[in-house]
């Protein structure tokens, strides 16, 4: 089953990573095309592209909004406030939901292009 990574804040303000399985259901999505597997949908507020060069890094910060990042090229490294570090190469999906608390830090390992989708509150 496919997964994505969720970054969230606990009740004490620490951020943590969680691997989330994506539930897919065989769906007649666009007949007469054959059925395909589809997940439930989430409302989105806006989306945009984000590009950063290798070596870019941030200080500790919470996510400005509930965002989902789809890494198209390059690689990001994100550190949760609990100390766990994860890499997000091209093809990765990160749902950043740590909008309160200590947040996380980020750095770009190799020149990166990502799509950022801001979710509805």
Region locations from a protein language model:
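Short, small/polar residue-rich loop motifs at catalytic or cofactor-binding pockets
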Residues: 1-3, 63
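A short glycine-rich, His/Asp/Glu-containing loop-to-beta-strand
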Residues: 14-60, 112-121
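Double-stranded beta-helix
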Residues: 3-9, 16, 103, 107-121
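A short beta-strand-loop-beta hairpin characteristic of the jelly-roll/cupin
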Residues: 57, 62, 68-89
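Short, acidic, Ser/Thr-enriched surface-loop or helix-capping motifs
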Residues: 10-11, 71
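Histidine-centered metal-chelating micro-motifs
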Residues: 55-58, 77, 93-95, 99-105
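Short, Lys/Arg- and Gly-enriched loop/turn segments at beta-strand edges
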Residues: 28, 86, 102-108
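Short acidic-glycine-tyrosine-enriched beta hairpin
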Residues: 22-23, 51, 81-99
């Amino acid at each position: 089953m496919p997964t994505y990574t969720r970054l969230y804040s606990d009740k004490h303000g620490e951020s943590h990573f969680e691997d989330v399985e994506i539930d897919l259901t065989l769906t007649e999505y666009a007949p007469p095309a054959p059925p395909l597997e589809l997940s439930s949908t989430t409302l989105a507020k806006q989306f945009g592209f984000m590009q950063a060069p290798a070596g870019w890094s941030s200080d500790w910060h919470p996510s400005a909004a509930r965002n989902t990042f789809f890494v198209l090229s390059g690689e990001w490294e994100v550190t949760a406030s609990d100390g766990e570090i994860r890499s997000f190469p091209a093809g990765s999906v990160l749902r950043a939901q740590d909008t309160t608390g200590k947040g996380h830090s980020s750095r770009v390992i190799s020149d990166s292009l990502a799509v950022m989708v801001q979710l509805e509150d």
